[in-house]
Amino acid sequence: MAQEPSFFVLAYYHFTAIADPHQEVKAHKEFFKDRNITSRIYLSEQGINGQMSGKREDAEAYMKWLHANPLFETMPFKIHSHHENVFPRQTVKYRKQLVALDEDVDMNQTGQHISPLEWKELLEKEKRPLLLDVRNEYEWQVGRFDGAECPPCDTFREFKEYAENLKTQVNPEQTPIMMYCTGGIRCELYSSLLKKEGFKEVYQLEGGIINYGLKQGSEHWLGKLFVFDDRLTIPISQEPAPVIGSCHHCQTSNETYYNCANMDCNHLYLCCQTCVEKFLGCCCTDCQNAPRVRPYHHQDVHKPFRKRHHYFKDDLTSKQ
């Protein structure tokens, strides 16, 4: 019997000038004290980028608390229900960059936000803009908008090179682009990067895939959504989601992610149950023979984003 969804999972971001982000980190930690909340929240002089989960009453209190702060009073939240917390711990940190791009971008020159309804209408046009998925390759393998251009990038930093190559393949002044990501924040930066490369007409999906699923359902979407927490994949709406991913080893239809058991690889990949047992949780035979391999137990599927000392308590070097 399915457990009742008594928790909220929140996704949110907001670009705003924060004079003392370290103080905001302290304020968050003080507010979270004695509350049933787990999180991955980053603050900088640029603003906030957050994901958190907690009991409904705690999540609602947090949203009310943030909206009472003039810095965040207009910030929208994207909300999913769940039956438990989805992060391994409570993390609130200062970060110099809200998104790792290593490129100066002009936040006054970003793409035009379009609502999920406007996005759907654009997708249904006979001649629509170039549809661009700006997530990592391992993310779009399990789900994407139908007909999207999906760059084979493993990190967000690689998109700069992709943008430079794209403008040699199409006319940037005559090629409109509609881009999307999970929750919207990567599009803020990447749309600015595209404009810097000379693209004149750039649209970005407001609130990302999460918001589209909440407002428009699964129309024009294929598969599931990769998320950066212990759920790993979720349907974007209540509608059934077809499996479009395939096993890294045998190519059979699959949507289950694993981190390679070789701690020096830790590659995130899709794998079926047969192959994960055959390769003992590793992405290749070389990794099986590596010196730092997590123990594989078929009844104890490894959750993502765990450090070595989670498995080897005496491994002090990994805690450095």
Swiss-Prot record:
Sequence ranges assigned to domain Rhodanese in this UniProt record: 125-221
Active site, UniProt feature: 181
The protein's enzyme class: oxidoreductase
Annotated CDD domains: RHOD_YceA (cd01518)
Any one Gene Ontology BP term: tRNA modification
Reactions catalysed, as given in the entry: uridine(34) in tRNA + AH2 + O2 = 5-hydroxyuridine(34) in tRNA + A + H2O
Gene3D superfamilies linked to this entry: 3.30.70.100, Rhodanese-like domain
EC number, UniProt record: 1.14.-.-
InterPro entries associated with the record: Rhodanese-like_dom, Rhodanese-like_dom_sf, Rhodanese_C, TrhO, TRHO_N
Keyword annotations: Oxidoreductase, tRNA processing
Any GO MF annotation of the entry: oxidoreductase activity, acting on paired donors, with incorporation or reduction of molecular oxygen
Pfam families assigned: Rhodanese (PF00581), Rhodanese_C (PF12368), UPF0176_N (PF17773)
Classification via HAMAP family: TrhO
Similarity comment: family membership: Belongs to the TrhO family.
Functional note: Catalyzes oxygen-dependent 5-hydroxyuridine (ho5U) modification at position 34 in tRNAs.
NCBIfam families: PRK00142.1-2, PRK00142.1-3
PANTHER family: RHODANESE-LIKE DOMAIN-CONTAINING PROTEIN 7-RELATED, THIOSULFATE SULFURTRANSFERASE/RHODANESE-LIKE DOMAIN-CONTAINING PROTEIN 2
Protein name, as recorded: tRNA uridine(34) hydroxylase
